[in-house]
Structures are given as structure tokens and as C-alpha cells.
């Protein structure tokens, strides 16, 4: 059945369909709805962290334990989580993980403008950039397969248009 979804809902749906067991995030617009939606799936243990670094480290722990995990935060949160991100980038994964940063190149709901694609480049991470809600579902699912196949962390950075503004039909 087709259903209308925001990008944040679609990211959560993709993680659920990929078999994610653990989700962590620090709340902040425009990424809050990702964990809120993940928490509606009883198969996923979802928790708010006291900051973005702790959210990242919790997801690392889940991955090291062999669980598929996801961590999400707003764009400026990646500044706080950069230290564990760079360490994790060369550690590899036991259980697949996807890092989602809700970038805001146009300052729609945040105090500053930041484009986190440079973090993926600097950490030498594979990055997927969905263009609509259906791609959010599909790319998040594919990220787990790719990450586990190549023993690497995957990074996704959807734009505000994809996450919040457009409501695209999704097959989920």
C-alpha cells in the first residue's frame, strides 16, 4: 500500500525495513522526527541521548555488539559528534550503521548554515544523498547492505526539501 511520508518518516521506515534494532539521537529541528518515528516500531529500541556525541557513541556500541543501528542529529550536532565519527570511520562495523545528519544549507529552522557533506569527505565515508522520500527508504535500506558488505560506516545527508518540505508517495 502506498502512503504519503515526509523524508524523516521515510528514513525511519527504511531503517525499520532494514532490520535496525537500536536508534539514538539528540533532538533538534530538522531531525527530531526521525527518532520520534523510529520509536513507534516495537522492534527498535529508540532513545534520546544527552548530546550528539553520546548518541554517536551509543550507536557505535550497538554496532560493535553486532546490532544494526542508526544515529541522527541536526547539522550542527555533527560538530559535537565529530570525534567519535572519525574514530568509527576506520574501526569498521559488526552490525551495519547509518549516520543521518539533517543538513540545512538554507537556515530554514536553525541558527546557522552548515553543509555536513564535508564531514563524509574528510572521514572518507561513503555517503548517500536521497532526492525524495522513496529514495530515503531505499537508500537507508541499501546503506546497511553496503556497510556490512564492505565493513564500513555509511553517512546520509538528505536536504531539507527531502526531509521536511515535500511529501512524496512511498511504497512503504
Each language-model region and where it sits:
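Residue-level marker of positions within ordered structural domains that often coincide
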Residues: 28, 148, 161
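Conserved anion/nucleotide-ligand pocket segment
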Residues: 146-153
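Hydrophobic alpha-helical segments, chiefly the membrane-spanning helices
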Residues: 166-172
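Thiamine diphosphate
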Residues: 1-133, 138
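Conserved small/polar residues in nucleotide/adenosyl-binding loops
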Residues: 155-164
